[in-house]
């Protein structure tokens, strides 16, 4: 007999669904979630589209705009569900913004943002194959380093 493990729905908080396969741990790390918050993490769950996805449920957490932008950079197809009293009150797909301030670190060691106390600023030049350019040193970055 096949047994299924059922995960209890959250009452108040956030569900991040359709996270690209195996990226939920990265999303979890960049959100700096308080240790005491109940969290459910599902990895490599089959989706209706025939691919795998990850799901992250966080009881008692409301995401900031910066949090949503960070998620969009890691998993551009993710969906955010805001839950209140056990019901979805808001659902939206993340969207990579045209400009990102202060949440990514420039990989150019000579960039002024790495030498002085200046907030980083990046332009998103291309969304489908992510191209991000530092507005200070003009360098395109290949790897995303979340700065806070």
Swiss-Prot record:
Keyword RNA-binding part of the UniProt annotation: no
Keyword presence, Metal-binding: yes
GO biological process: 'de novo' pyrimidine nucleobase biosynthetic process; pyrimidine nucleotide biosynthetic process
Gene3D superfamilies, A to Z: Aspartate carbamoyltransferase regulatory subunit, C-terminal domain, Aspartate carbamoyltransferase regulatory subunit, N-terminal domain
Cofactor requirements of the protein: Zn(2+)
Origin superkingdom: Archaea
InterPro entries, alphabetized: Asp_carbamoyltransf_reg_N, Asp_carbamoylTrfase_reg, Asp_carbamoyltrfase_reg_C, Asp_carbatrfase_reg_C_sf, Asp_carbatrfase_reg_N_sf
One Gene Ontology CC term in the entry: aspartate carbamoyltransferase complex
GO MF annotation terms: metal ion binding
Swiss-Prot/TrEMBL keywords: Metal-binding, Pyrimidine biosynthesis, Zinc
Note on how the cofactor is bound: Binds 1 zinc ion per subunit.
A Pfam match: PyrI_C
Transmembrane segments: none
Positions with a binding annotation for Zn(2+): 106, 111, 134, 137
HAMAP family: Asp_carb_tr_reg (MF_00002)
Self-association state and partner proteins as the record states: Contains catalytic and regulatory chains.
Similarity section: Belongs to the PyrI family.
PANTHER family: ASPARTATE CARBAMOYLTRANSFERASE REGULATORY CHAIN (PTHR35805:SF1)
Its biological purpose: Involved in allosteric regulation of aspartate carbamoyltransferase.
NCBIfam families on file: ATCase_reg
Protein name (record): Aspartate carbamoyltransferase regulatory chain
Source organism per UniProt: Methanococcus maripaludis (strain DSM 14266 / JCM 13030 / NBRC 101832 / S2 / LL)
């Amino acid at each position: 007999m096949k047994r299924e493990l059922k995960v209890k729905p959250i009452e108040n908080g956030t569900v991040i669904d359709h996270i690209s396969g195996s990226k939920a741990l990265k999303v979890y790390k960049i959100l700096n979630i308080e240790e005491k918050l109940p969290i459910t993490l599902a990895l490599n769950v089959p989706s209706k589209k025939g691919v795998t996805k990850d799901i992250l449920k966080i009881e008692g957490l409301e995401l900031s705009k910066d949090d949503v932008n960070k998620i969009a950079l890691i998993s551009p197809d993710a969906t955010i569900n805001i839950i209140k009293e056990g019901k979805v009150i808001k659902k939206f797909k993340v969207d990579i913004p045209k400009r990102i301030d202060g949440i990514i670190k420039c990989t150019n060691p000579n960039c002024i943002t790495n030498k002085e106390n200046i907030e980083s600023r990046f332009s998103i030049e291309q969304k489908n194959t992510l191209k991000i350019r530092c507005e200070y040193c003009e360098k395109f970055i290949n790897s995303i380093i979340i700065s806070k």
